[in-house]
Amino acid sequence: MMCDQTSNITFRLFSNMSDFLRSRIGRDLFIVAIIGLIIRYVVGAFFTYPTDVNYWVIVSENLFSNEGLYGLPGYYYTPVWGYVLSAVTSVVGLLGIPLGEYVPELVGPNMVLDWTNTLPSFGYAMAIKTVLFIFDLLVAIVLFRIGMRLYGEKRAFWMFTIWFLCPFTIVISSIRMMFENLEILLLLLALLCMVERRPSWAGVMIALSLMTKPYGIFLCVLMIGYSYVQSQSMRYTAQYICAMAVTALVLFIPVILNGQLDEAMMWLTNRAYDTGTGYNSTLNLVPFILFASFVASALMALSGKASITALIVTNAVLTSMTLLNPGNIQYYLVLLPMALLMSYRSNIIVIIAFLILSGFAFISYSTWSSVLYVHEGYIGSDLLESFVSILRPIDSTLSYNWFKSVVAYTVVAVPLLECVRRRYAER
């Protein structure tokens, strides 16, 4: 059920921020935000995983050379993240911050790295991280707003806090420097717009999310059925679908006209042949899971009954099924907000699994990530060698992959077991 007893000050979160910050909940959230940002900057100052940020350096160099996102090899994603990189590159250029440099001596049989010889400068890395930290904070704010609508102030506060202080979230933005949080932000904005009966904006946001990374595809389909149930009108659903289609078209028209569609889709198409990440096996399952999402959406529309929590749980289960075969660690971040939004008390199990996974992620990334600062003299090579010698024996690929699977299986199993328990209790 939606919480009807939310205070007026909460719904003025974006329109009257000063009043909100003077409230008790506003002060508490502000303190959590400050603590989370301090942790991120401290961790980010010492650790930078050198891939894929090496590609961000190459993309920025392409932009400075007026080659665009796809003019030279280096950028293999759809344009949304590229536009963010373009903005960061402009600011970095205005401030005179160097992008990075080519360091051939880093690659070799006795070197720490064996896959990249392009390192970002400290300033460039921190500029990218700052943008990712802002996305983390915006995700927390949107989670809070959705939580207020669904569950009330106390639950919404803990959703904000768990997301923003979760070590897993911090590792991905501070060390791994991947933009999963941008995809999640757009996904949650789509969900919020649907909750607040704004189908056109929901369509825009879900399209932007899909054009960032494709994990919103199941929510995209499920919201077709949910939008019809919300209004009992095809016009409402048509607004959602049309806004989504127009947004996707606007984003891709320049790419198509320049003949760069292959490059824009390379991240997805290359994964079909990538046996190292397990993504190729996952792609074989996607048509079946997508079919299941269409069936669920149709059943939702035909029944005339749907709750936002049922929509969230169904999306969490379908999305986690694509991650049952262990893939890259950052992909699993999309499951965390879904777990926080599920109404079942058992989602604490999912949170615990994420906390354990955070430890493995930190150990795995940090053993490789300080080479940038050794090169720049930020820390000594002896200190890095000592640090790595302690952590590397703990970094077990077998255990690491096992816990990634545990997270995905838990997100599938917990809501299903809870449904069975509730049915049994009703008898």
State where each predicted segment sits.
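Multi-pass membrane glycosyltransferase architecture that uses lipid-linked
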Residues: 3-4, 8-269, 282-427
